[in-house]
């Protein structure tokens, strides 16, 4: 892929954080699609991303469990996440841009409540807006003219998602599977991308942090830290191969309506994918997240893979 297209796509892949908007249930940690490797462009840029994550594997620590191994009053069975993320970025100064990300979640959750030895399945299914994210990004234009580009960003996750979704029986879902957390969270991040003379393509890395600033109704979600690093490798023409690795650490939830014993996790994943620059304005991409290490606190549901597909375009 020619350099201008490679820089465009590397920027789309370098700053993780889309996971910050889908409530406390698991969402993809791979992408945030904010441009890193080019100057802040004046005007508007939009992107949309679809995610599929099926959590149906019980884990205790790093060990996989079968349902028969769990002796609990409350047995988790499945959480199916189909998320759509919509992002909009506006470059209002040569080195500054502002962005808004709004998630929409289609989520199905099933657990079994054991009442005096009788298993009672309880299910929830909803389509809801999650917690929005607003950020400011600073990228020195002078640094993007050479082989290295970097940026920093900060912002807030806002409590726009509901925290009181109920099922057909009138039972309220656990706070961890609600579309929103009810809290305002601080978001910080920074990334770097570099083209090396000795290697084709672009290397990139990004660190993101998220910390709740308050609690809501006796619930405070755990903080998050994510590290993404990878290599955007030209394949042919405008097609690039994405070789990426992610590390995600989630702290325990707190509060009287939280489940601190069964929340918090550490995950390492390989994330291969493809990116195609349709034009200088439009890019499409797809990635497959494959966990290679998962450690959970207590007993939790985990996933075997996650899939994301997206589209990014500049609005002239």
Segments the model singles out, each with a brief description of its role:
Residues 18-68, 145-147, 151, 316:
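Outer-membrane beta-barrel biogenesis signature
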Residues 36, 48-50, 86-90, 100, ...:
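Residues on the lipid-exposed face of transmembrane beta-strands in outer-membrane beta-barrel proteins
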Residues 42-56, 175-256:
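Detector for outer-membrane/organellar transmembrane beta-barrel domains
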Residues 46-54, 100-104, 152-158, 205-209, ...:
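Transmembrane beta-barrel strands of outer-membrane/channel proteins
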